[in-house]
Amino acid sequence: MGKRLKSFTLKMIGGANVATIIIMLLIGYSGNINPAEHPTIASVGLFFPIFLVINLLFLVFWILFYWRGALIPILGYIVAYVPVRTYIPFNYPSTPPEGAIKVLSFNVYNFAVADGGRGLDNGIVDYILNSGADIVCLQEAAMHVLDLEEVAPVLKKEYPHSIVYGADSNQDCLSIFTKYPILRAERIKYDSDSNLSLAYYLNIDGEEVLVVNNHFESNKLNQEDKDKFKSIVKGTMDNDSVRTESKLLLGKLSGAVKVRAPQVQKVADYIEKTRKERGISAIVCGDFNDTPISYSHKKLSENLTDCYVASGNGPGFSYHRAGMFVRIDNIFCSEEWQPYAAEVDDKITLSDHYPIICWLKRLSNPK
């Protein structure tokens, strides 16, 4: 009787493990779904880490109580290798070679002036000045909140070329500060009340390079929504509430992803068209407001390399407020560039985002 009960229990647990893997796979490849057609299904990527962790707990259980069963979660990770690596990559440590340029993308939360000050004592301004980056792309960067008489000359000395866009409108303010000449710039047009993307054409060591700075549509989750998501992830919410709140969260997420998808498509089309017509390389960065398991990420990954996936390590959470930890800030590059040592720098906490950094080396013979 005891053996039968044990066998039955192990089969039930094995079945639950298989079900977890199936859900993990479905969510992991949900980025292939066009949000315009199925917005709810395309929004479930936010829940991917939950099933990633559940499968890990199954692995621990099997190792402790029936080691042969460990094959189930291990096979699960193998078949879900692509989304798992996209979400939490691991790479050999790489040292940026001589001649590599350093790119920094940072949603600066309008420089968090309440906590950081308005002058050179502002922690975010100080971080940028001491970053050593060659190209700095900022989102939510309303410069007028700073003491520009004090800050502007110092920024100009470190970064002689810059463009600040959107400071005098209701839209987000995007900025670029760079050591390279800016040949021209233009806005990539798409529908949005406040978000935007800008294309800059830089002269990097005699070659024209397209740099695109993005701040795509926000998910518009309030503090209560974020607290509930945190409770779902931590498992402190009862099952009935989990179902109810998950549906409500998915409703908000699906509304945002439906707006965001055509924005990403416009940017992807712009980059592809420009590269074909002008034969130039591209660097794309910004706050995507989407996780690595998303249509936005999948669309831009079709013709570009995610620098963090290619050279970073760990989940690289770039948003870190209100109990939500997700990687929504990105740096991508075209095939002419090789990324090195991408990282999300969690040492500066003034903004609700951490900056993402990567070194890029121009390849002499791209594939």
Located regions from the model:
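Surface-exposed, flexible loop/turn segments at secondary-structure boundaries
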Residues: 111, 144, 219, 290, ...
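Structured beta-strand-rich core segments of catalytic domains in phosphoester-bond hydrolases
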Residues: 27, 73, 77-98, 115-116, ...
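Acidic/histidine-rich helix-loop elements
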Residues: 105-121, 143, 220-256
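Metal-dependent phosphoester-hydrolase catalytic domains
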Residues: 9-64, 71-75, 186-188, 261-283, ...
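Active-site beta-strand/loop signature of hydrolases that rely on acidic residues for catalysis
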Residues: 102-108, 120, 124-148, 165, ...
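N-terminal, active-site-proximal structural segment of metallo-dependent hydrolase catalytic domains
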Residues: 1-154, 166-171, 264-268, 362-367
